[in-house]
Design a protein with these regions (language model features):
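CheY-like receiver
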Residues: 12, 24-26, 149-199
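Two-component/phosphorelay signaling modules centered on CheY-like receiver
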Residues: 40-59
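Alpha4 helix (beta4-alpha4-beta5 surface) of REC/receiver domains from two-component response regulators
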Residues: 47-48, 92, 106, 117-132, ...
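Helix N-cap/capping motif at the beta->alpha junctions
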Residues: 60-69, 90
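Short amphipathic alpha-helix used as the core "switch/output" element in two-component signaling
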Residues: 69, 91-105
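Active-site beta3 strand of CheY-like receiver
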Residues: 74-80
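Receiver (REC) domain active-site loop signature in two-component systems and cognate sites
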Residues: 85
Length: 199
């Protein structure tokens, strides 16, 4: 009895999971992503990950200044940004972008993807208004989880004193749960306490 009663639920769960996966797939396929990284090899690695998870519209910039111009030119749905770059580093780029009334696209979601994960960088990225902070090398699943979180649970942009960026996290997981998507875990950082600063 219990086994038979469980069968419809299992089937329904699989069907809901399939629908949810289709929705996520369509969302991911519809976005335009800008990769800003001075390392050509890393741009290729990130591009390959994005292609493998279904992203079709991908642009690249080799430094912060080129990244700013690209954001102005085509207003991507998401920016994946390195920290250490020539001419203009990632932190400086975020500071310029998060300037409503000055920069034309201040609300663009930003994922900081860097091999430099010292605690002060995580704190600084959070203060500057970065949406997510990930450590290189990143897995396809980790990157997909963050992208899905940004697409399905967009946090309102708020101004708090000198800060302009996504509202600090509270209860933003309900829309994801309705789609059958598990909320992402803490960012992949080298220091155990650093990830908590982004929550």
């Amino acid at each position: 009895m219990l086994g038979e009663a469980g069968k419809p639920a299992t089937g329904a769960s699989k069907a809901m999971s399939s629908v949810s996966n289709n929705r996520v797939e369509k969302l991911v396929q519809s976005i335009a992503v800008l990769i800003v990284d001075d390392n050509q090899y890393m741009r290729k690695v990130i591009r390959n990950i994005l292609v493998n998870i279904g992203v079709k519209n991908i642009h690249e910039a080799a430094d912060g200044i080129a990244g700013l111009e690209a954001i102005r030119m085509f207003a991507p749905d998401l920016v994946i940004l390195d920290w250490e770059m020539p001419l203009l580093n990632g932190a400086e780029l975020v500071r310029i972008v998060r300037s409503p009334g000055v920069f034309p696209v201040p609300d663009v979601p930003i994922i900081m993807l860097t091999g430099h994960v010292e605690r002060w960088r995580v704190i600084e990225a959070s203060r500057l208004g970065v949406n997510e902070f990930l450590k290189k090398p990143v897995s396809g699943k980790a990157l997909l989880d963050r992208i899905v979180a940004i697409l399905t649970c967009p946090r309102a942009m708020v101004r708090l004193g000198d800060y302009y960026g996504p509202e600090p996290r509270k209860l933003f997981y309900e829309p994801m749960q309705k789609m059958g998507v598990s909320p992402p875990t803490a960012p992949e950082t080298a220091e155990p306490g650093a990830a908590k600063l982004m929550v």
